[in-house]
């Protein structure tokens, strides 16, 4: 049961890079229309229905959005044009350039880091759900304490998720971090008793890299995509209660008061969606954040 960096390697992301480029081009080509009156890029109003172009990572984000589209959107005069995106950068670049009206995939720490690094003018308008990050292994271990000295631990490479993963490793007792650093990197590891090699790869590649490592720290959505059951398979799992890592519905700050986006935020925090999440992910891998 679950308990509740970096000699960097060359990223295994040539294919992923090509995919990112292709998705970005597709979004630019088909998603940059404004609304009928030109007020919000990524929203088109026709015959009383506002079509919102929204980008999301596959699991569980696209699944949640598709349920909202199929069950709630029409009643609010909305239609969701859902763009499935497999990386952590394109949803924000596409929101920034107007290809999307909103995105749904990121946590507050990641959003803060992106705003600071890229200068985005974004804001969250709804906390939707939590996907606990976990420490996994393919070695058959039942405890992180079984990890070999000098072994490799794979983490998500974007700074916010690297920091989140490092904090989970600290919770597991594998490393100690400088407590004065809010978003730590490998440079802030002050103790590493097992001399673990902390390696980062693209988030979508962490689960695939698990076979070559002692441990892998995997985001909840990528664990689901890899067929893992967090409550069963994780050696250590983040607690869901009072988590600072809610997945958010994010829009451009200038658009936060748009009536159609406000309606969408309401649907994303509706009792109906809460019940759907609780009934669908009964293993606790996805937890409502509202």
Label the predicted regions.
Residues 125-175, 274:
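A conserved helix-loop-strand patch within extracytoplasmic ligand-binding domains
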Residues 132-144, 245-258:
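A bilobed periplasmic-binding-protein/Venus flytrap-type ligand-binding module shared by bacterial periplasmic
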Residues 26-29:
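C-terminal motif of bacterial Sec signal peptides marking the signal peptidase cleavage site
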Residues 11-15:
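N-terminal export leaders
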Residues 82-93, 181-208:
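Short helix-initiation/N-cap motifs at beta->coil->alpha
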Residues 162-170, 268-288:
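Periplasmic-binding protein-like
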Residues 31-33:
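Bacterial signal peptide processing site
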Residues 43, 47-59, 78-84, 152-153:
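Short, well-ordered beta-strand elements
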């Amino acid at each position: 049961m679950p308990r509740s960096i970096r000699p960097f390697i060359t990223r295994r992301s040539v294919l992923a890079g090509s995919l990112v480029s292709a998705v970005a081009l597709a979004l630019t080509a088909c998603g940059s229309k404004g609304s009928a009156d030109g007020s919000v890029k990524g929203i088109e109003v026709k015959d009383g229905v506002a079509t919102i172009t929204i980008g999301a990572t596959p699991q569980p984000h696209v699944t949640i959005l598709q349920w909202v589209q199929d069950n709630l959107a029409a009643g609010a005069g909305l239609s969701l044009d859902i763009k499935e995106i497999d990386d952590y950068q394109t949803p924000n670049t596409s929101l920034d350039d107007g290809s999307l009206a909103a995105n749904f995939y990121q946590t507050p720490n990641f959003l803060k880091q992106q705003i600071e690094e890229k200068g985005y003018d974004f804001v969250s308008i709804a906390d939707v759900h939590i996907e606990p990050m976990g420490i996994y292994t393919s070695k058959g271990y039942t405890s992180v304490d079984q990890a070999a000295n000098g072994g490799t631990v794979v983490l998500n490479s974007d700074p916010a998720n690297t920091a989140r993963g490092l904090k989970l490793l600290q919770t597991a007792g594998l490393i100690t971090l400088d407590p004065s650093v809010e978003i730590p990197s490998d440079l802030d590891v002050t103790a590493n008793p097992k001399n673990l090699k902390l390696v980062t790869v693209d988030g979508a590649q962490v689960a695939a890299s698990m076979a070559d490592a002692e441990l892998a720290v995997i985001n909840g959505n990528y664990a689901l995509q890899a067929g893992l059951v967090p409550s069963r398979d994780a050696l250590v799992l983040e607690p869901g209660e009072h988590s600072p890592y809610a997945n958010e519905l994010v829009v451009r700050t200038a658009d936060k008061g748009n009536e159609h986006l406000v309606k969408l935020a309401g649907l994303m925090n509706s009792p109906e969606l809460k019940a759907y999440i609780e009934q669908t992910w009964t293993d606790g891998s996805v937890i409502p954040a509202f």
